[in-house]
């Protein structure tokens, strides 16, 4: 696809539109593309029958030490890092031949293979129920772990070749022929080895192996005191029930701690494979506390974690003796008037077991800090990175050059680039291919190379192998434009100002755009924390549904308001204790800009969003009822009283301490303001935004005499799965077709 203009967000302004209230500048544009074909939702929507063919092709790779291996369903290939050429290592048929004598089922795909030992020709193949360890040079099966259907693999440990798994809600560890049962009281109320605190604070799992593989730290969560939300499972269509089984819907209650209510209690255990014993960290009473970002010392003798109070404004980094569970010392303490949100564990330097890297936003942006343990556990802290940009991820270390490999948005707020940071000087060197676009990198074991998978607004996908020391890139793969031959709209990106705050937007113009015509507009909104919609990926990260709507003759507009991610603490915390208010103010600046455009029909503006975006959709429809004619809100939060403790209280405090904020942001009191056409869509079995939200809003509308439309997906969670997603977007599209066009 031809790109006529692409400028970074810091580059020279291309066009300027000015009113007394709003300034806007266009920062980049990808031209429309003429073609003979038109899109369907089967092409563009996840779950669609042709979606796979319409997505940019990819190459799946992993590192074998410093060697790059490409994986596909049928074979694994060694990739030459300087030429990009491939040599076959082994195939699926080879694996099945080497394990044939085990009487087990065949391996059907090699995507789930790993090469955990840099200097050994060993591959680990995980089929879900079997884990095979194979020497692919000797063509020999070294070991296998067999798991029954009721056993859930949690985490394998290459260092000790042990595996942690769950069975009947209890935690087990196996190594060789030995099996240890770590718990006996596991149940729906007592949860072991799984993610806790509703997946907040960077928690995505519940087990943590020590570096030597001889100890396993794990979460234990007691949620017996948490109120059940009464979810219900209904029978599947066409399911033939046994004569002994009722065909009546069954109760499937879910533990759901709502804001201001009793939350669960979490403790951390440490199992020692050498002694077969478990100790628990002596962290004190776990009531109304959060334990997160578990990590280990280099020698596996000490365990660290961040401890946060329920108000989430007082955070401590604490060290514990991994043998006894005793508290050793508090290393670091951070407070904030609004909230502290620890998301990343500390990581020790590979060349210095006395120093580690910590991430913090204490200066207003997420940055790296070098921490060195001194006498009497005094922590010496030196800031390594600084500036009005954020470290987005820490990928690891280049041990030879003593540098840290990071992803950041230093070059532009809408980009993600890879840098090597020298630990001694703090100097940063670009370590990706070209410095433009959005880069996702996979770091080699030594840190000398990154597998750089990226896109730009005009490039669907490129992959390069980059030397982190000198930035030299070896091209590996370039995806063809999967939309070649189709009629594709123009995608542009720019910014507007709300006071001194710059806000980035994306615009998708209708196909066959005519500037002399007036077009209906759909404003797509999310608006919440830990997300953004506008960046320098292909088509400025446009959702495929926007392309479909452009084909239908709509202009689509998306703006990242204050509260969204990667713009610093002040930008995010502007919404504190008043979710939706500042966000609406920013979104309306976008609408003001739209109204200055001669091709926008200001009488036909619609809005659509999901989850937090559903909350924003109804907020906008009921706060500015004369602006938005049509809205579609999916899985909307209606009242923050009913959202989960960790997320809700971070941004709103508790209902007890912020009653005015909860009332002001509740949509129940705005049901009477609804004037336009509003459709609410909900997954019946949503455990994220429970159906109580939308059902209560419907009750409020009945009482107020307003008339929203409503549709529910039985059996579906917060997001529609599989082909039902196509059905969902057909419904959303048709609603705008019926009432906005």
Where on the chain are the PLM-derived regions?
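Beta-propeller folds
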Residues: 7-8, 24-440, 448-449, 459, ...
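C-terminal segment of classical bacterial N-terminal signal peptides
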Residues: 15-23
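Compositionally biased regions
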Residues: 5, 18-19, 565
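Bacterial N-terminal signal peptides that target proteins for export
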Residues: 1-9
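Sterically constrained small-residue positions within well-ordered secondary structures
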Residues: 15, 147, 162, 259-262, ...
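Serine-hydrolase catalytic core recognition
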Residues: 228, 300, 439-741
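Juxtamembrane/transmembrane-helix boundary motifs in multi-pass membrane proteins
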Residues: 2-3, 198, 543
